[in-house]
């Protein structure tokens, strides 16, 4: 092998290869408890936001909810999220951050503790009640 090839041919370290074998053979079910927990969090948010009038397609493989802001509220997703953050100290992401077709939507993560999610949903309900257009 010439000197040049020594720097072009690489592989994972032997230790890392053995660790990968162990993880793939013995750790197949290690993620199952977290999967159950994430589904619980997702379903809780879906229920609470649907009650508030958000339209949501249930995600099957992500840690995020992408929800349509209900009619009768400011449809400017950036302003909606900015006002919510300022008034309720909870961050959600405006849909427009994901492109022009995301306008009118918001994105929330459910990769947070259940306590944090419950607080966020309580504050979102308060915010929606305070900002409903008559």
Residue ranges and their predicted role:
Residues 4-134:
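PLP-dependent class I/II
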């Amino acid at each position: 092998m010439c000197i040049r090839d020594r720097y072009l041919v690489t592989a994972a370290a032997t230790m890392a290869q053995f660790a990968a074998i162990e993880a793939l053979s013995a750790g197949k079910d290690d993620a199952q408890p977290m999967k159950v927990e994430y589904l619980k969090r997702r379903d809780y948010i879906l229920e609470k936001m649907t009650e508030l009038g958000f339209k949501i397609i249930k995600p099957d493989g992500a840690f995020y909810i992408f929800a349509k802001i209900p009619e009768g509220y400011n449809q400017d997703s950036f302003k909606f999220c900015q006002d919510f953050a300022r008034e309720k100290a909870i961050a959600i992401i405006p849909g427009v951050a994901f492109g022009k077709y995301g306008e009118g939507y918001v994105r929330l993560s459910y990769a947070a503790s259940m306590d944090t999610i419950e607080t966020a949903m309580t504050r979102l309900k308060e915010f929606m009640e305070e900002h409903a257009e008559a």
